[in-house]
C-alpha cells in the first residue's frame, strides 16, 4: 500500500510540473499572438493602399493591351503552391489541416506530378520531401513576427519562377486567422493576378495620370510589389494563426493536466484512507490478541 501511495504521489508531482510548463507556454503563445495580431493590423494599412492603387490602375484604360506576364493567363501546364506550416509542433491541428488540404489538391488535380511546392516551415518541408513530392524551394526558421527582409527572398523567388514559366499559376495555401479559437484553410490565387474588386479602387483614381517613364515599366515595378505584399500578408496571417493554435493547444493541455491531478488526488486520498483503515484494523486485532 505504501508503494501504491508513493507511486500516485509521484504521478501527481510529475503532472503538476507538466502543468506548470504548459501554462507557461500558453502565456508565451498569448503574448506572441497579441504582437502578431498588431503586426497584421499594421501591415493591412499598407496592403490596402497598394491594392487600391493596383485595382484602380488595372480597371483603367492605361493597361489595355499590356503584355505583362503577371496579368496574362496562359495554358496551365504546371501549378506552383506556396505552403505555409510551422517549424515545430505543439500547435494542435494547425499543420495537419494544411497538409491534408494540399494532399487533397494534389490527389484531385496533380496525379501526373504537374505541380511544384514552395515550402515555408520545416513541418511541411519534411512532410512533402519524405513522400518524394516536388519541393523546389523551402524556408525554415521563420521568426515569430517575420519581417519582409526574412521572407523577401523566397517571395521574390516564387514570383520569378512564375515569370520564367517554371509554373503557370501560383497559389498560397495557409491557415487564415479568424480568432483565438478558429482558423480557416485558404488556398488563394496569387498569379496570374485575378480580377480585382472595382469597389477597392482608390477614390482619387489614376486614370487621369500620365505614367512615367511608360506604362510597362510602371507595371513591371508595381505588379511584383503588389503580389509580394499579398504573399507576405498571407505569411503574417498564417503566423498569427499558428500562435493562436499554440495558445489553444497549451491551454487544453493545462486543463487536461489539472483534471488528471484532480483524479489522482482523489485516488491518492482513497488509497490513503484505505491504508489508515487497514492500520487501525491491524492495531485493534493485535490488542484483542493480547487480552
Swiss-Prot record:
Transmembrane segments: none annotated. The lineage of its organism: Bacteria, Bacillati, Bacillota, Bacilli, Lactobacillales. Belongs to the ATPase gamma chain family. GO terms for cellular component: plasma membrane; proton-transporting ATP synthase complex. It is found in: Cell membrane. It is a peripheral membrane protein. Gene3D superfamilies: 3.40.1380.10, ATP synthase, gamma subunit, helix hairpin domain. It comes from the Bacteria. InterPro entries: ATP_synth_F1_ATPase_gsu, ATP_synth_F1_gsu, ATP_synth_F1_gsu_CS. One of its GO terms (molecular function) is ATP binding. F-type ATPases have 2 components, CF(1) - the catalytic core - and CF(0) - the membrane proton channel. CF(1) has five subunits: alpha(3), beta(3), gamma(1), delta(1), epsilon(1). CF(0) has three main subunits: a, b and c. NCBIfam families: ATPsyn_F1gamma (TIGR01146), PRK05621.2-1 (NF004147). The keyword Transport applies. This is ATP synthase gamma chain. Keywords: ATP synthesis, Cell membrane, CF(1), Hydrogen ion transport, Ion transport, Membrane, Transport. HAMAP family: ATP_synth_gamma_bact (MF_00815). GO terms for biological process: proton motive force-driven plasma membrane ATP synthesis. Produces ATP from ADP in the presence of a proton gradient across the membrane. The gamma chain is believed to be important in regulating ATPase activity and the flow of protons through the CF(0) complex.
Amino acid at each position: 500500500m505504501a508503494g501504491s501511495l508513493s507511486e500516485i504521489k509521484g504521478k501527481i508531482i510529475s503532472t503538476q510540473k507538466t502543468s506548470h510548463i504548459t501554462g507557461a507556454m500558453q502565456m508565451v503563445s498569448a503574448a506572441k499572438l497579441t504582437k502578431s495580431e498588431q503586426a497584421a493590423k499594421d501591415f493591412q494599412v499598407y496592403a490596402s493602399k497598394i491594392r487600391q492603387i493596383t485595382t484602380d490602375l488595372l480597371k483603367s484604360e492605361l493597361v489595355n493591351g499590356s503584355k505583362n506576364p503577371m496579368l496574362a493567363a496562359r495554358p496551365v501546364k504546371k501549378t506552383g503552391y506556396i505552403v505555409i506550416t510551422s517549424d515545430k509542433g505543439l500547435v494542435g491541428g494547425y499543420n495537419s489541416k494544411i497538409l491534408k488540404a494540399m494532399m487533397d489538391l494534389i490527389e484531385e488535380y496533380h496525379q501526373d506530378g504537374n505541380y511544384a511546392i514552395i515550402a515555408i516551415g520545416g513541418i511541411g518541408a519534411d512532410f512533402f520531401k519524405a513522400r518524394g513530392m516536388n519541393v523546389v524551394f523551402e524556408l525554415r526558421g521563420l521568426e515569430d513576427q517575420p519581417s519582409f527582409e526574412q521572407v523577401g527572398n523566397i517571395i521574390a523567388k516564387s514570383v520569378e519562377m512564375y515569370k520564367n514559366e517554371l509554373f503557370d499559376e501560383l497559389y498560397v495555401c495557409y491557415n487564415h486567422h479568424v480568432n483565438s479559437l478558429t482558423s480557416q484553410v485558404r488556398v488563394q490565387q496569387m498569379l496570374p493576378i485575378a480580377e480585382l474588386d472595382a469597389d477597392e479602387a482608390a477614390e482619387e483614381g489614376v486614370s487621369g495620370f500620365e505614367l512615367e517613364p511608360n506604362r510597362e515599366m510602371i507595371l513591371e515595378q508595381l505588379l511584383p510589389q503588389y503580389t509580394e505584399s499579398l504573399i507576405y500578408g498571407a505569411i503574417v496571417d498564417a503566423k498569427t494563426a499558428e500562435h493562436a493554435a499554440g495558445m489553444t493547444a497549451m491551454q487544453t493541455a493545462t486543463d487536461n493536466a489539472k483534471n488528471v491531478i484532480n483524479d489522482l488526488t482523489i485516488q491518492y486520498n482513497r488509497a490513503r484512507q484505505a491504508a489508515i483503515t487497514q492500520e487501525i484494523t491491524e492495531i485493534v486485532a493485535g490488542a484483542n490478541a493480547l487480552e
